[in-house]
UniProtKB/Swiss-Prot annotation:
Binding locations of ATP: K274
Note accompanying the cofactor annotation: Binds 1 zinc ion per subunit.
Enzyme Commission (EC) number: 6.1.1.16
Principal subcellular localization: cytoplasm
Gene this protein is translated from: cysS
Motif position, 'KMSKS' region: 271-275
Keywords: Aminoacyl-tRNA synthetase, ATP-binding, Cytoplasm, Ligase, Metal-binding, Nucleotide-binding, Protein biosynthesis, Zinc
InterPro entries: Cys-tRNA-ligase, Cys-tRNA-synt_Ia_DALR, Cys-tRNA/MSH_ligase, Rossmann-like_a/b/a_fold, tRNA-synt_1_cat_dom, tRNAsynth_Ia_anticodon-bd
Family: Belongs to the class-I aminoacyl-tRNA synthetase family.
Renumbered ranges of motif 'HIGH' region: 32-42
Protein name per the record: Cysteine--tRNA ligase
Binding site for Zn(2+): C30, C214, H239, E243
SUPFAM superfamilies in UniProt: Anticodon-binding domain of a subclass of class I aminoacyl-tRNA synthetases, Nucleotidylyl transferase
Reaction catalysis annotation: tRNA(Cys) + L-cysteine + ATP = L-cysteinyl-tRNA(Cys) + AMP + diphosphate
Length: 462
């Protein structure tokens, strides 16, 4: 059976995955900054790395999965002030909303979900170590900065040289930075900032910079070196580059062995932004589409590829998922455990072990669905449900999915049942024109009728 290979951003190639400790995986993913509702870009990060940890566990690894919460940030401070609420009130509200969104999408809770504000002592200890190693300095404005020029490996993740990076930077003469690429480790307090965001330190009152938060939380919960670090492609530079500089600058050795980055989400082939009016929260999307459809839509694309969001693509995902559930509607699975040596399962495993190739893995699921349609095999139904369950799909009764997503579902079901009865009466009276009219009228409402042996008629969404 195949071995897992992961595309390592740092190496720029797929590599055989070998954990530091045999049989155990330590993984960290950059989570949300909680000042607003999560958008579909966040949904992709959640689902992609949920998939990764699910597959690692299914492969027999003992996984420790950490996904942080950034609950202190300039945007958070600004939004709380605008709303007239405390930082903690704002962040808790959006943490609760994030948890609801994640649960709807079938995203399992990480083993640890550290909040940055609970790890300030660890951040201060890391900054102190960097200062002792000659990599941090206090600037004239009171901030403590990281000295990029003094870390030899800077740029190795992004593949950019210091000269190339500096060419794109503007120097602010008032910052006191030694180099325009230097970044803040500790931000000195400003008079107008609330006391909630001020901590004491040997450098004066202040709060941590964004990059130091992840380094400190990751090292505290997973150790100074761990297996996998993930996040969106937008975090590769500067955030992850700066994490490497901080963590390796403090410890003197490798921080992370495998760096994983999921691709961008675009909307109708354009960059998602509020200014373009194409910015959608998870909640807005879930008002129109079933949560499992959204998860399926995300998994149909390879995690490293660009994902293009549109209503048409979500409709297509819904139709595809409907085909799989329809295959299971009339075939109950047997009660034996999933057979990972069966031919479809082997191909599924090979796809997932090839850098989490979900498009190929889902193609295997469709092969199973097609064979179930032909053979009505309980064994194949068990295999389809079992394999799909590994990636968080097809875990509802088929009829529940096929009847879901209808506005006023209870009233609609009553109406449909009544129309099916009226159609049956019309057919008995040999009024086939009326029977056809009822079928066509329901189809216009997105309902497909299927006549079964014995005079039974079932329905499903189109």
């Amino acid at each position: 059976m195949s071995a897992l290979k992961i595309y390592n951003t740092l190496a720029r190639e797929k590599q055989l995955f070998t954990p530091i400790d045999p049989g155990k995986v330590r993984m960290y993913v950059c989570g949300m900054t909680v000042y607003d509702y999560c958008h579909i870009g966040h949904a992709r990060v959640m689902v992609v790395f949920d998939l990764v940890q699910r597959w690692l566990r299914a492969s027999g690894f003992d996984v420790t999965y950490v996904r942080n919460i950034t609950d202190i940030d300039d945007k958070i401070i600004k939004r709380a002030a605008e709303n007239g609420e405390t930082i903690s009130q704002l962040t808790q509200r959006f943490i609760d909303a994030m948890d609801e969104d994640a649960a709807a999408l079938g995203v399992q809770k990480p083993d640890h979900e550290p909040r940055a504000t609970n790890y300030v002592p660890q951040m201060l200890g890391l900054i102190d170590m960097l200062e002792r190693n000659g990599l941090a300095y206090k600037a004239a404005d009171g901030d403590v900065n990281y000295s990029v020029r003094d870390f030899a490996g800077y740029g190795k993740l992004s593949g950019k040289s210091l000269d190339d990076l500096r060419a794109g930077e503007r120097v602010d003469v008032n910052t006191g930075k030694h180099d325009p690429l230097d970044f803040v480790l500790w931000k000195s307090s400003k008079e107008n900032e609330p006391e909630e965001v001020k901590w004491s330190s040997k450098w004066g009152s202040g709060r941590p910079g964004w990059h130091i938060e992840c380094s400190a939380m990751a090292c505290e919960l997973l150790g100074e070196q761990f297996d996998i670090h993930g996040g969106g492609a937008d975090l590769q530079f500067p955030h992850h580059e700066n994490e490497i500089a901080q963590s390796e600058g403090a410890s003197g050795h490798t921080f992370v062995n495998y760096w994983m980055h999921n691709g961008f989400v675009r909307v109708d082939n354009e960059k998602m932004s509020k200014s373009l009016g194409n910015f959608f929260t998870i909640r807005e999307v879930l008002e129109k589409f079933d949560a499992e459809v959204v998860r399926f839509f995300i998994l149909r694309a390879h995690y490293r590829s660009q994902l293009n969001y549109s209503d048409a693509h979500l409709d297509d995902a819904r139709n595809a998922l409907t085909r799989m559930y329809t295959a299971l509607k009339d075939v109950a699975p047997d009660h034996l455990p999933l057979d990972m040596t069966e031919a479809h399962a082997v191909r599924f495993i090979d796809a997932m072990n090839d850098d989490f190739n979900t498009p190929l893995a889902i193609a295997v699921l469709f092969e199973l669905a097609n064979e179930i349609n032909r053979e009505k095999s309980p064994v194949l139904a068990r295999q389809l449900i079992g394999l799909a369950g590994i990636v968080g799909l097809l875990q509802r009764p088929a009829q529940q999915f096929l009847h879901a997503g209808l506005a006023g579902a209870d009233e609609m079901e009553t109406l449909i049942i009544g129309q099916i009865a009226a159609r049956a009466d019309a057919k008995k009276a040999k009024n086939f024109a009326e029977a056809d009219r009822i079928r066509a009228a329901l189809l216009e409402k997105g309902i497909i009728l299927e006549d079964k042996p014995g005079g039974l008629t079932e329905w499903r969404r189109a």
